[in-house]
Structures are given as C-alpha cells and as structure tokens.
Amino acid sequence: VDLSPEAIAWARERADGAGARGVRFHRGDAFALTAAGAALAGPYDLIYDSGCFHHLPPHRRISYLALLERCLAPGGHFALTCFAAGEGGMGSELPDAELYRTGGLQGGLAYSPEALRRVFSGLTEIELRRMNDEGPRSPLFGEPFLWTALFRAPAGR
C-alpha cells in the first residue's frame, strides 16, 4: 500500500524481478484501506513500513498504533524503517510541541531507540539497529541514517 503510483510501479517491478507471485499492490491511504471492514483490514502475519511512520505528525501515532492493533495478527511481525536521530541520522529532532509551533515536520521525524521503544511498547522488540551502509553496487538497500526494526505482536491478543 502506498499513496505514490511511482512507488507501486517500482515495488511491482522489484517483485516481478525477484519472481514473487501472489503479491498484491494497492495505491491509496493505508489508514482508509485497512479500516475495520475494509478490503485490506487483515489480519497480517507481517506488516512492513518503509518510510510512512517518520512522515506522520505526532498526533497520528495514535491512529497508527490502532492500525497495527487492528491489522497485525496475534504473534505477527512488524518491521519498520525510519529516520534515526543522533549523529549521522536524518530528520527533525524537534520536540513534538515545537513541531506544532513551527507548523511542519521538517521533512520527516527522527527517532531515538528509546522513543521507538516507547511508541511500540505494546510489541516485543526483536531487533532495533541502524541499517548497514550498502554501496551503490550492492543489490541491497542500506543507509546508516535509518533505523531498521523488527517487533512481534503478543500471541494471545
């Protein structure tokens, strides 16, 4: 799910190139497409967010967590890629209140490991680390200004 038709086309191209079958791509708002009773409401064994969370204003974290609660299967995994705060990171490190005073997200929000653990405290952390730096010749994507994280939902929820 992505708002961008270019992102959907790129993802479809990558999936086809990898020989992935049965992958469905949807263009639209992830919040609307996964609402209760909607076609994509889930549950899913894996939800992967690459670049959505760090572009949400602070007040949307509540609806984001509600989306995960609604769509992630018991024992399912949530993988996240987002801007890292601190040296070598990227994104705004302003406090939430200051973001509202300035009227913008400054290109995206940077998170510390502690902030991510606090936001996703209802999930079990499996791994949280900076991405490896992958060079331009690597077939893999990796930028050290990003966090990569894996969490698991409780099995009995």
Give residue spans per PLM region.
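Class I (Rossmann-like) S-adenosyl-L-methionine-dependent methyltransferase catalytic domain
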Residues: 1-42, 56-71, 76-157
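Conserved acidic residues
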Residues: 45
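A conserved beta-strand element that flanks and buttresses the S-adenosyl-L-methionine
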Residues: 48
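Short catalytic micro-motifs in class I SAM-dependent methyltransferases
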Residues: 51-55
